[in-house]
Amino acid sequence: MAAESTRQKESTNGRFWNFIDNIEGDKVVWVIVFMLILFSILAIFSSTSLLKEGSKDRMDFIRDHIMIVGVGLGLIAGLYNIKRIGVFRVLSQLGFVVSFFMLLLLDLHVKIPGVVEAEYINGAWRTLRVAGFQLHVFEVVKVAMVLYLAWALHAFKEDQEALKKRQKSKYMRLSNSCAGGRLDFLSRPFWKRTIYMYIPILITCVMVLMGSGSSAVFIGAILISVLLIGGAPFKEIGIAAAVGLGLLLSIVGLYNATDGKVFPIFERVATMTTRFEADYDVDNLKHLRKGSREFYEELDKIKQPYSAKIAVHEGGILGKGIGGSTQKYVVSNIYGDYMFSFIVEEYGLVGGIIIILLYVSLLARGALIASKCTNEYAKIAVGGLSVLITGQAFMHMMVNTDTGPMTGQTLPLISHGSFAFLVFCIAFGVILSISRMARKQIKAEEDAAAPLYEGERDDIQASLDILEQIDQI
């Protein structure tokens, strides 16, 4: 019976490892996904303060999150099993249209009861409620625009190759249809990039600026990074970035000079500039009379960022342990915008370093996958999404450690926020699906790589054998 039980265990273990070996996507990315989700479940369960949840107890909260995790894993699995890159490429063409339409509804503050309603939350227009579901527009825009630019850069390259061969291009038909007429200049490479890349980026950032200045700057930086990954001319990118920065500074200057009378729709510009100049120091309270209105206004302003700094400081090397956080009772949204501070408080510097290594590993693995992709769209999509996820993670960490301006960026796949979590699951699903294309080449190179110290291994073993013989004498 014991032997049969052992054989059954060995058979089960064999099937498990065979299943692992047969996973076609990048295994390192899979490990990163599951590690981030594990941190998310543990951290959200522990960070949920019963004092803050009111009508919900902790188990209700964690059950909701586990359900979202299940849906997210389902999205990842569904996208992972799409084996044709053309499906992603076709859908990516709609990225700018989807972003523009959602931002338009948000910026116009559309309210059609029961259908779609723009929502004003925490002093900003950020979300749409569609048929009862809350959609965080900026999260969709980030991923959609990265994928759109991946398509545009791929389409431009294919278009130029077709024209060099004197063949009819099936891409960028709008510009090509202008060839030979008064608008012939639109068929030139610079104007094609301007129409399909630079103008969509500019429009998107301006529309995001109406709701969040910091998000507009962050999204603009990520999209410029995607252009660099795709090989767009550095000179043109520099000009486009300078134009965008000049436009932003002009809006900020006019808004501040006229006290908001010019460009009143950009009310978040004032918030953005205030956050860049803000000083979240407890010493600011010393010159105010305790109990006064000004005292409590200043206290409310610094409470969350200052408590996040306290959480990081009190975490030490190993942290307070699961459930040991005290700052979760002070920071109302610690499981969202201040998740990294909470993790460091409970898991210490060790936990913080693990989180950092996971995101850095994702960026490194994304770069490796991209370098092995033969398809231009696949390379840019994986590289762009990896930069987006890692960039947002580090932006979140900078806010939590008071080394960057205040923004509302969550920690990807860890922070609470059902819609943001699902959007990043889509991003990971695309990365894993595309990694199938590069897996065989990566595996072949890893297998071919010589082990470290291969030449010395036999010498070491021979020395050990001699020592063993001496002991036996």
What do these predicted regions represent?
Residues 148, 249, 253, 271, ...:
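Transmembrane alpha-helix boundary/anchor motif
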